[in-house]
Amino acid sequence: MLDMMNNSLSYNRPECINFQNNSVQKNVIRVCENEPNTFVGSGIPSQIIGKQGDIYLDRITRIYYKKINGVWVKNVCNNHRCCYPKECKGNPHTKGEKGETGPKGIKGEKGDRGLKGEKGNNGDPGEKGEKGAKGDKGESGEKGAKGDKGDKGDIGEKGEKGDKGDIGEKGEKGDKGDIGEKGDKGDLGEKGEKGDPGQKGEKGDKGDFGDKGDKGDIGEKGDKGDIGDKGEIGNKGDVGEKGSKGDKGIDGTSILFGFGIPSPDLGVDGDLYLDANTDELYGKVNGQWIPITNLKGEKGDKGNKGIDGEKGNKGDTGDKGIDGSKGDKGDTGNKGDIGDKGDQGIKGDIGDKGEKGDIGEKGDKGEKGIKGDKGDIGEKGNKGDIGDKGEKGDKGIDGDKGIKGDKGDIGEKGDKGDIGEKGNKGEKGDKGDKGDIGEKGDKGDTGSKGDKGDKGEKGDKGDKGEKGDIGDKGEKGDKGDKGDKGDKGDKGDKGDTGDKGDKGDKGDKGDKGDNGTSILFGSGPPSPDLGMVGDLYIDVTTDELYGKVNAKMNDNIRVSAKVNVNKQITLQATGQWIPLTNLKGDKGDKGINGNKGDKGEKGDKGNPGTNAGKGEKGDKGDKGDAGTSILFGQGAPDPNQGVDGDIYIDTLTGELYRKVNGLWVPEIDIKGDKGEKGDKGNAGDKGTSGEKGDLGSKGEKGDTGEKGDKGNKGDRGDKGIKGDIGSKGDKGDIGNKGDKGDRGDKGIKGDAGLKGDKGDIGQKGDKGTKGDRGDKGEKGDAGLKGNKGDIGLKGDKGTKGDRGDKGTKGDRGDKGDIGNKGDKGDKGTKGDRGDKGVKGDKGDKGNKGDKGNIGIKGDKGDRSDKGLKGDKGDKGDTGDIGLKGDKGDIGEKGIKGDKGINGSKGYKGDKGDKGSKGDKGNKGDKGSKGDKGDIGIKGSKGDKGDKGDKGSKGDKGDIGSKGDKGDKGDIGTKGDKGTKGDKGIKGDIGSKGDKGSKGDKGSKGDKGDIGSKGDKGDKGDKGSKGDKGSKGIKGDKGDKGTKGDKGIKGDKGDKGIKGDKGDKGDKGDKGIKGDKGDKGDKGDKGDKGTKGDKGDKGDKGSKGDKGDKGDKGDKGEKGSKGDKGDKGDKGDKGDKGDKGDTATCEIVNTDGQTRVSACNTGFVKIEASGYEITTAPNGSSDLAPDPFDPSNVSGMNTKLFGIQNGAFRSGNFTATNLSDIGQYSAVFGYQTTATGSGSIVYGINNSSGISSGSNGSLVGGLANTGGIIRSFSGAEGSIAFGSSEINGIITTGFGAQGSIVGGYSSGGTIATGSGANASEAFGQATTGSLITTGPGAIGSSTRGYSVGNSVITTGLASWASQITGYASNSGIIFSGSGTSTSDIIASVTDSSTLTIGDGSIGSSIRGYCSSGSLISLGPNSNGSIINATVNNFSTLITSSGVNGSSIVARANNSGLISISGNCFGSQFVFNSINGGNITIGSTHAGSQIVGSANTSGIITVVGGLNGTLVAANSSSTSGVRISTSFGSLLAGNATTGGWFRPGQAQGSVIAGQASASGVILTAFNAGCNVIGYANRGSTLGINQNAFGYSVMGYADLNSTITSNALGANACRIMGYALNNSTIFMDSLVAANATDLFGYANNSGVIQAADQCAGALARGVAQNNSSIVTRGNGSMTFGFSNNNSTIFTGQFSDGCFVGGYANSGGTISTGSTSPASHVFGFSNSGSFITTGNNTNASTVFGYATANSTITTGANSNGSLAVGYTGSSGELLGALGQTSFAIGRNNTASGAYSGAIGISSYANMEGSFAHSSFQDTVNPVSAGRSQNIKVMGRKVGTQIVLANGSYATLPYDGYGDVFARLIGSSGTAVGLTFQVTRTAGTYTVAPPITPSGGILWLSPSGVAAPPLAITALGTSGFTITLTDAQNYNCYFDIVNYSS
């Protein structure tokens, strides 16, 4: 069993036994005590051989066994499952697993050649293997010792400069500097925005009209009165007969509408045309269409804020942003720490693995490859890297993709900060510029008056505002609640109309007048029966404009089809009201003024309208018909112009008038109110002029503004001065990028990109010694993020070079026997050198291109950490190189230090120092495990190589060849190289020569068989030839294994870099002899291996010692038996046989071949070359006629075939008569009939019949001119087919169940009979033909092509039937009524129709409808399905009752999809484009609606949606409108001008995205939730009454998340507002108890508008952003940074504001907001303040770095408490009877006080109280203590402080009270007066008390010498001569005026 072949057990190690024959099983018990042994034998191994860990290969089965716990375990190889050779060949993936052994396989490949013995003869490189095994590697092992120092390299990881990268993050603060630019007063500007609402007040004037509007609301009801007028039209209906006057109606102006510019031939002079796409209104004059106006309201008003845009000046500050960019990298540095994981990431580089191909250079390790042969398998390892593809490794160059580190550049996403340039839009931030207005605000306390302008809005309530009514109305009309009174007015209106109604009677004649367009008014959507086609209808509640069109957008359609049962089917599309546009522009704020609409009550007078009964007088209405004329002009209409009922449009204002009783009455402004959205226009002010930001210096003027308390904010303007620097930013257009820097904050997101920076952390890679883990590093492949390559620096791990130990895996190369292919892989071993490749991380430098990010490079310093990648290098060995791309970043050459890794060979060497330990080299025997070391290539484990004591790992030193990676060393530029110093460790190795013992390891080589696995990878770039590793591993020539199946011949690998000549290892089994390695030291001549299969010819290795002549190959197997030879030539004719007996049963012709025999009972045998049947009894074959000739009228006698019920009847057949065929018969001919069941009938039928009357028959033929092809009734299971023309019929009989009918019919019919269940009719029907199943044909199918008024249908009540087909040219496809569960699959074009009849429950339509065609689902077709496309003015219609149904359809090119009737639990999936219109009516409970509207497509849901789900997409000016939804889920996407407008929504959820001017807005909303994303000028929100709802989302790029609903109580709005976007509560009335929170950045705004009482706003405001509430009892708090603002608006009494304000930020209440409270922290030029005139308010907080805590001007009775730092901060109380407590305080109001250090007081009756303490005795003997007193004058200040000479800057006087407390317990109280007159100071101590001394303590103590001296123009001093130290306390009372 045990076959000790030459390759079986060959050991050169003295401690191992070398078996050379098969008889020594008993001596095999312990072949080698220190290492596992490999046995090769035939059959299952005996349990008596081997020891724990030994391997046994059954040469017969190629199954490996491992001895575990005394038992041979099958299929275990080095703790891995082994595969069968075929498996290996068949599953390259498994190869991947064993890739470790794969390297051996590499040898195997060459080994194949070894099998050739050719190279084997060359001295059996195995001898060289001997060297490999021992000493050579041992030498390398010595170097390994230094490798131990490599571990110190791990300490290098501590050197993580990456941490410094964190400092780079500080650079991010630089970004904040960018924000500083925004810091411009722009924040105050936001208050200026409040001023903008003042402008809205202007609109309020219109609002006055709004008051009327309120009436208008009532008026709307009044409009209903108008509807009453329509009632008159109804009367006209009665009079309609008189239509003659209607002709005059024709004279009336028609309003036409369409999509696009009107056609010149459309309409007549005086007509109007409305372009539904643009809302442009045209009038026809002299035959030409002239644009008159645009019905859309203007939004422009808000553009005023655009003025604010000027603040862009501060944008200049953006220059700092440039610095910030560096900061970004700093951030990345932090992530760099994470980079440690990045080590794995290095493998991520491997992800580039093609790049690893570069590691393929490691292929140089291939020299190890001599071991490398195993290395070939290693190539598999490459596969691990996919390295075989290592050439792909060149892709490794792609590894430059590692540049993904460039992703760090993604940090450049900070560049998105460049988007921050959009930050330049931040210039829109110029809205902050509004802040500039805010600067005015500075003055703008007065500006606050602007806020009063808001009060002006109250003015809006003024009736005068009424003019605005019409525009703003409607929405504000919500206020129209008062308008309810107006409702009475409505009645009045009706009355008026009613009178006209009388005229309406004549209007009846006006029916012709209908040609004139009527404009109707009403509340809510129009009733379907209201108005005529062409009329317009205005919903006064929503200002929605509807037009009445017929269902097909043209004439009514009437389609009829004649069915075989003569049933008439009529389809008619009646006029439908289609929403055209909304006359109102954005509902402007002015709507608020609409409140005054109460006056609308005057409409009550309209009550007389109840006289509508007079409508009979409507005859006069005939004239009224003319009244329908629409006039237009500029300005108000002339009283003499027009007649009652006429309409007049003022083209200047858009005001619409109606003439009533001879007076022009304004009714509505067809132009919508200018919406508040105009405010966004402010953003438009991009104020790119922001460069004017230099004007920010005007902010300095803001200092002047200080006169205005807000002027303090002007101080912030000083920062604006920095903005001047920002002007440099102008230069810095790049600086603008700096602006991006602002966004750069977001750029922090970029940090993710910075992950590349993580590479920096890679420096931690120094830990690379951990590289042992590098194995895991392979997982790192995912780490491609590592590509950020900065990580590449990890190259430091180069120490992994130790991994070279893995080279020991080369031992596996023995297995290489199998992997002959592996030879090429040898080069792959050089890949080991790839470890140096870690330097390849330099490739990271490629990232430097990213450096464009600039600052980020700074982070690169962190990159030194990247050395970690070095660990990877081990792994890579193939693809790690890909990291090179990263190199650019890493330039740190330090990585080259990785080359030191070559020293790794020395791995063992470290222990070598212990030379004595070399004995441990025995452990090296374990080195065989080193084979696993190949896995070690992952390198990090290589560090474990230190255990190199096992010396065998020293063999891994071969891996040192990885030094090749050094090519990548480019990255090494990083200087981190220092890690390289570790390399020096190599020197120590020299001692380690002991290692030679390791050579024994060769035994492992057996595993090499596995090597076959590695398909020869693509030839990787030839890695730099690594240090020639000790070749020895190749050494032990394994016993020549049983000649394995010739391993899959891998691709011939590139000739591996010839590894260093290894120590002469034990002569390995010859098989390994694959690649001829460098000629190693001549090893012991190995046993002559069995001649292996001839491998591919390997690269010619250095000529090895001449190997033993291989054994003669086995004799080939006997070839398979050859193919049967060709048939031999025919033999000679045999002799004629004897004459036989004469036969009586056979007749033979003289030719000997023609014969007839009847020798067998019952059979006649004929042998002849031809046959004839004669018709005459004389047997002559020459007689005519031919029995088959038509002239044969007597037929052919077939009686001989007349078997009972046989195939043919008895008798003669003629050519024209084949009738009456019996049962089981067949008939062929003309006009044929078969009567027998199971018959077959074929024929040609001219106006007659081809038929079968029996079951299971088949009938076919041609029927023409009324001919019939059929099976008769009862012919179940029959088939009828053919061609039926000119009224021909192809049919089965009635009740012919399971039958089939098919064919072609032109004007004919193809049908199954009635009741023909489970039947099928198919074919083509043309020219009025019919393809159908009969009525009641359950489970039947009809399919075909219907053209030319033809019909494809199932019969009535044909349940579960199916129709499939195509209908064209008025073709019809339909299922009959009651055809439940039927199915139609069809296409209809050219005015064709596809229909499911009434009551077709559970049916389905799948079809295409084009060119004016119709798809229709009949009423009560519940549970049905329609999947269809409606195109080119076609229509898809359902009637009522399609509950539980599903409609999936597309409407295109003005196609119409209309769903009417209640649909419960149904599903609708639509796409409406190119003017397509989808309308869903009635109620849809529990349904699902999914749709997309594009290119002016419209989806309208008219009915209520209860518990319904709607998902829609609207783009390109398209829209989705939903009337009412309860408990529903509405989701939509509105882009490119698209809109998604749910109507009344209660308890519903609305989610969506609005982009590119898209709009998602709901109307009345209660208890709903609106969620979404608004981008690029889009809007998301609610615009009508709303209660208890929630809006949340993300708004970017001038977008808005809003609620501009009236009465939005108890609601919540939340989200993220960025880049001039707004999260906005724009409720005009009673928006109480709302909650607003979010994040606002880059001029973003979070705002609760006016009258939001009890509101709560909170969040973060950055970069000229603001968080605002306006309403009593509100609360606002958050974080305000970079000129951002947190505040409440004007007149917001009793509010609470708090937070943190930084970098010019402001926390404030609005002006005139008494009893408010402000608290917070103010830093870097920020403000915490109340607004002006905020009486009885409080401010408290902390202010530092030139920040301010103050009450506003004239904020009487207020309190300011806090702490201010010493750098010029100010804590002030600016109103009367106010109080300031803290440091650097001011009490600037009369009767106020300030207490604290550096206190100020400057008004009558005020005081400042201050104290100080001086341990140096400020008033000791001989010293003077200066008391600084700043004089008093109205508006100035008094200061008491411990400064230099006290002065009074202004003329005036005051009393000073001082208490001096001495250190000895004495005290002195004194008083004096100081006066300044004309710049000269005098001091006047009072006479009483004497000298000003008020008292002494203790009493009786002598008064110290005291002098108070005026210093002329310098102030005054107090001199106290005493030996004590004094503490002083001062009070000053000011008396001057």
Swiss-Prot record:
The UniProt regions of compositional bias labelled Basic and acidic residues, in chain numbering, are 296-514, 584-605, 614-625, 670-899, 907-1141
What are the annotated GO cellular component locations?
virion component
What PTMs does it carry? May be hydroxylated on lysine by the viral-encoded procollagen-lysine,2-oxoglutarate 5-dioxygenase.
Disulphide-bridged cysteine pairs: none
Please give the residues the UniProt entry marks as glycosylated.
6, 21, 515, 902, 1178, 1192, 1212, 1217, 1245-1246, 1255, 1317, 1422, 1427, 1432, 1443, 1452, 1477, 1494, 1506, 1513, 1533, 1598, 1619-1620, 1632, 1641, 1663-1664, 1672, 1682-1683, 1732, 1735, 1746, 1756, 1784, 1842, 1934
Residue ranges of region Disordered?
Answer: 88-248, 294-531, 583-643, 670-1144
Record key words, sorted: Collagen, Glycoprotein, Hydroxylation, Repeat, Virion
Its protein name is Collagen-like protein 7
Q: Which organism is it from?
A: Acanthamoeba polyphaga mimivirus
Q: Which domain of life is it from?
A: Viruses
